[in-house]
């Protein structure tokens, strides 16, 4: 059994024209998916970094943007809806914990 490390190595194995076309499509979609996932991670990271500022309005805006980006990824088929729901739930839990601690102070 041959172990392939990348799509380029698979490209060498493609014999038919349609297989080569499919490989090109896969490359394009893989790149698109990586970009979208990277964007989602960036927005989540920015939200987590903003939690340290304790500025509720700024945090709320970052939360809104992160949720929006997660929803976009779901609509484009990059993330499963349950994955996005789980990530949003964690974000809201952090936000609500911050609100609760802020109201206790």
Curated annotation (Swiss-Prot):
Molecular function terms, GO-annotated: small ribosomal subunit rRNA binding; structural constituent of ribosome
Cellular component terms (Gene Ontology): cytosol; small ribosomal subunit
Record flagged with keyword rRNA-binding: yes
TM spans (from-to): none
Keywords: Ribonucleoprotein, Ribosomal protein, RNA-binding, rRNA-binding
Pfam families given in the database record: Ribosomal_S20p
Function description: Binds directly to 16S ribosomal RNA.
Record-stated family: Belongs to the bacterial ribosomal protein bS20 family.
Protein name: Small ribosomal subunit protein bS20
Source lineage: Bacteria, Bacillati, Bacillota, Clostridia, Thermoanaerobacterales
